[in-house]
Amino acid sequence: MDYNLPIPLEGLKETPPTAFLTKTYNIVEDSSTNNIVSWSRDNNSFIVWEPETFALICLPRCFKHNNFSSFVRQLNTYGFKKIDTERWEFANEHFLKGERHLLKNIKRRKTSSQTQTQSLEGEIHELRRDRMALEVELVRLRRKQESVKTYLHLMEEKLKVTEVKQEMMMNFLLKKIKKPSFLQSLRKRNLQGIKNREQKQEVISSHGVEDNGKFVKAEPEEYGDDIDDQCGGVFDYGDELHIASMEHQGQGEDEIEMDSEGIWKGFVLSEEEMCDLVEHFI
């Protein structure tokens, strides 16, 4: 008796697609999440529109994790390629809408231990290089910090010296202005300076002559020395105070020593400023 036995389906002999591919296909096919992930317009790729939401909602349902980067790495191992630089769009020639049976043609890439070792060595090399760069930068910043500390210390020392000089100057002035003879000497020199300026103006005016309606200025060589002898100008404030203080009696040795230390160095006043100073104290 002959029996017509059924012929086994050819598909039963083939290896089914992996669980990862099947689950990924199901996620993309789910129309309820099209706003998160869906097929592209040409149905030959899929797009993850909202990666964060995809990781929080879709991945835990099928893969029991919410790591989007891990999902992308898995796609790479199955030959998927990211085809758009501005969005998360992936494609594989056998991953097509309505063609689930083609999933069996997608194979996982076999990675040898040597390839993995080389990859790890490359990562280790990059980490070491980054570490060396950080160490160099750290040394540079520390040196800069020390330089700034040194600069600040020098500025503090200069400030202290300036404050001491100012205090010594004020103490010296307070002692001097209490003595009438000192102020009289300053007034006398101030009046002499005013007189010198007036004489200078007279000398300049007297040497100008009218020549055919034009004012002719005399050459400075003819009487430049006389003008210099009669003119005042800018003088060192410390020298004036020193001279004035020496002109009256009763100056102590400590005051002379204070003046000789150079506390007046850098304090320069014009005759007009000296006049204002004298008028202020008198």
From Swiss-Prot:
GO cellular component, one term: nucleus
Name of encoding gene: HSFA6A
Protein name: Heat stress transcription factor A-6a
Membrane-traversing stretches: none
This protein's UniProt keywords: Activator, DNA-binding, Nucleus, Phosphoprotein, Stress response, Transcription, Transcription regulation
Taxonomic classification: Eukaryota, Viridiplantae, Streptophyta, Embryophyta, Tracheophyta
Post-translational modification: Exhibits temperature-dependent phosphorylation.
SUPFAM superfamilies cross-referenced by the UniProt entry: Winged helix' DNA-binding domain
Pfam families: HSF_DNA-bind (PF00447)
UniProt organism field: Arabidopsis thaliana
Record-level Gene Ontology MF annotations: DNA-binding transcription factor activity; sequence-specific DNA binding
